């Protein structure tokens, strides 16, 4: 039974997901339904957490919009995600960057990762 579930989950995994880590800045294009129309909406933010669970993997993006912090948890292999683009690689030492929630301005900056 579990082999069948694993096979079905393997078929539903997206193949075009780039590799990213906490601290990276991503631009995610998400399908948004408004009434009867569908359109793409871009959400750009810093990855503050990643949850690796195969088909159920998720990541949390954080951005500051008009002085208000906005966080969005997205399923990595969700059909509403059209594309993921890594804009900037950040150098951080932690896997979960929840401390960025309390910081603003220059203290919330993340250094750029050089090399790989």
Swiss-Prot record:
Q: Which PROSITE patterns match?
A: RIBOSOMAL_L19 (PS01015)
User: From which domain of life does this come?
Assistant: Bacteria
What's a Pfam family this protein contains? Ribosomal_L19
Q: Write one Gene Ontology MF term.
A: structural constituent of ribosome
Keyword flag Electron transport? no
Q: Which UniProt keywords apply?
A: Ribonucleoprotein, Ribosomal protein
Swiss-Prot/TrEMBL GO biological process terms: translation
The record's annotation in Gene3D superfamilies points to: 2.30.30.790
A GO cellular component annotation here is: cytosolic large ribosomal subunit
Name the InterPro entries on file: Ribosomal_bL19, Ribosomal_bL19_CS, Ribosomal_bL19_sf, Translation_prot_SH3-like_sf
Which function does this protein serve? This protein is located at the 30S-50S ribosomal subunit interface and may play a role in the structure and function of the aminoacyl-tRNA binding site.
The UniProt family comment states: Belongs to the bacterial ribosomal protein bL19 family.
Descriptive protein name: Large ribosomal subunit protein bL19
Which species expresses this protein natively? Answer: Haemophilus ducreyi (strain 35000HP / ATCC 700724)
């Amino acid at each position: 039974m579990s082999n069948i579930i694993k096979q079905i989950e393997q078929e539903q995994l997206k193949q075009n997901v780039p590799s990213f880590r906490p601290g990276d800045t991503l631009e995610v294009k998400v399908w948004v339904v408004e009434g009867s129309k569908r359109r793409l909406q871009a959400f750009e933010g810093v990855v503050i957490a990643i949850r690796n669970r195969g088909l159920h993997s998720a990541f949390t993006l954080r951005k500051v919009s008009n002085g208000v912090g906005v966080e969005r948890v997205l399923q990595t292999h969700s059909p509403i995600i059209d594309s993921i683009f890594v804009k900037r690689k950040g150098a951080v030492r932690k896997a979960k960057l929840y401390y960025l929630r309390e910081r603003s301005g220059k203290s919330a900056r993340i250094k750029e990762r050089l090399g790989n």
